Amino acid sequence: MLFNVLLRYFWRNYSTIENAAELQLRQDHVVTLESRPPNIEGKGEITIRDLVINALRMRPDRIIVGECRGGEALDMLQAMNTGHEGSMTTLHANSTREGLSRLETMVLMAGMELPHRAIREQIAAAIDLIIHLERLRDGSRRVVAITEVQGMEGDVVTTADIFKFEQVGFENGKVIGRLRPTGIRPKFIDRIEQAGIHLPASVFGVGERLRNY
């Protein structure tokens, strides 16, 4: 699971919220929260949204929501926009672009009468990166796109693909290909470098793109 790989690089003091605990956590000071369905009398339900709201009261550095399916998306965005950088969640969509549209729909499910532009502004401010996984025709799951959310242009959230999966063949029932840089240097790279992580421009194919011209 991609989440488990990414969480290995987290330090501590974060909260995870899931319908059923699946994440493998080894760090210190991690709070794991699980939702609970109602009993036979229809009482006692604890929703993902309830848990997001309560997790914020614990003052974690980051909040990890296993999957956003409804109104909790609004609380997640607000958490990301109020100092909880590095927070993550997942959702189901056919592309990174459709993922943004679905996220907007889920925010509306919170029951708040927010203008579409206001929701998109929150999305653009909160999210830096979208990783799109897809099941390929050989049944394997691969990262097929890593996309940066760059901001707003008018009423539209703007994005740019930083890496895209390129299929070069299909042999013995297996898809052959790899993730290739698009030649676009992400805007958030300065923040990464401020954290002490220095990536050469060649990682993003910037020099390669110039040579191709």
Predicted region positions:
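Hydrophobic positions on the alpha1 helix immediately C-terminal to the Walker A/P-loop
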Residues: 1-2
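Switch/coupling sub-region of P-loop NTPases
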Residues: 5-126, 132-134
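C-terminal helical "lid" of AAA+/P-loop NTPase domains
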Residues: 128-132, 145-148
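NTP-binding/hydrolysis catalytic cores, primarily Walker-type P-loop NTPases
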Residues: 139-213
